[in-house]
Every structure is written in structure tokens, then in C-alpha cells.
């Protein structure tokens, strides 16, 4: 039922009850009726506004909840990335220092392995071997290990760097025929590639 029909019914009812009243009473009654209708209209407007505000409030709550979830997800992702970077830094943090130490260590190994019969030199060689062992122990404590590449091993491009290809009948194709310097791993990652000669 529309608002206009409701108002007509109210008017009929109101006038039928008040036929015998005086003109002044009718005027008073009209004023009260108009006040009532105005208040009813205002009340309906207020109720409509309250309903609109409730709907807006629900919409804003949903948006806020969604935004909060997005922010929490972003914080979680950033935390995971930070933790991953921190783990990688701890795991591979010694890489640069180790790379700088490995080249002189390899030179020292070549000196120790060079043939020499001089007793004075042999005493130095024993001292150098002790130093090499200490450096290897320090490197291993940081999860850095020599690959221990040997002549006869198969060439692996993921671990070795071929410096020279040598024609030979003694070895199969892609078999290592000479090791110029050993390679090193840090955890599961190549730190320094072994430099080798390969049979072709």
C-alpha cells in the first residue's frame, strides 16, 4: 500500500470521527494531523537513512577486512622473503672470503706437490701441509669443501671448467686428463669451478 493511500485512509477515519466538532476543533485536529504526518514522514526518512548507514557500514567493514587480509598476507610474504634472505646470507655468507682464499691455497698445494729432494725444502713443505690442513678445516667448518677432482673423472660442465681439450687414446672422450686447480662447493652450490684438461 502506498503512502498516499495510507494518508487518505487516515484522513477518512479522522474526519468520520470528528464530524460533530466545531471549526476550531477541526483546525486543531488538522494541525495535529499535519504534525503527525510530518513526523511520520521524518521518521520514515530517518529509518531509511539508518538503513543506508547500516549498509554503508557493512560495506566498509568488508572492505576493511579485505584490506586487512591483504596487508597481513603482504607482511607474511615480506617476512618469508626476509627470513629466506637471512638464511641464504648465513648459508653462503663466507663465499666471497672463501673465493679470495682458494686461489692462494691452490698455489700453496702446487708448491707442496712439486717434486723436491732438498731436506730444508722438505721441512718447509711439512709446515705448508699443516697450514693447508688448517685452512681446509676452517673452510669445512663453513661448509666449503674441495671437489677432489681426479684425472680419469668424467667432465661435468656443472662442476668443471675445461681449460684445454687434449687428443689422447688413453682416455675416453670427455674424461679429465689433467687437473689445473681443484673446485670447491659451498653447501650444494659451486663456489669455484675446477679447472681441468679434457680428452677429445
Curated annotation (Swiss-Prot):
Signal peptide residues on this chain, from the entry's feature table: none
GO-annotated molecular function: adenyl-nucleotide exchange factor activity; protein homodimerization activity; protein-folding chaperone binding; unfolded protein binding
The keyword Cytoplasm belongs to this UniProt entry's keyword annotation: yes
GO CC terms, sorted: cytoplasm
InterPro entries linked to this entry: GrpE, GrpE_coiled_coil, GrpE_head
Keyword field: Chaperone, Cytoplasm, Stress response
SUPFAM superfamilies documented for this protein: Coiled-coil domain of nucleotide exchange factor GrpE, Head domain of nucleotide exchange factor GrpE
Compartment annotation: Cytoplasm
GO annotation (BP), single: protein folding
Function: Participates actively in the response to hyperosmotic and heat shock by preventing the aggregation of stress-denatured proteins, in association with DnaK and GrpE. It is the nucleotide exchange factor for DnaK and may function as a thermosensor. Unfolded proteins bind initially to DnaJ; upon interaction with the DnaJ-bound protein, DnaK hydrolyzes its bound ATP, resulting in the formation of a stable complex. GrpE releases ADP from DnaK; ATP binding to DnaK triggers the release of the substrate protein, thus completing the reaction cycle.
Family of this protein: Belongs to the GrpE family.
Subunit structure: Homodimer.
Name of this protein: Protein GrpE
Protein species of origin: Mycoplasma mycoides subsp. mycoides SC (strain CCUG 32753 / NCTC 10114 / PG1)
Chain's gene name: grpE
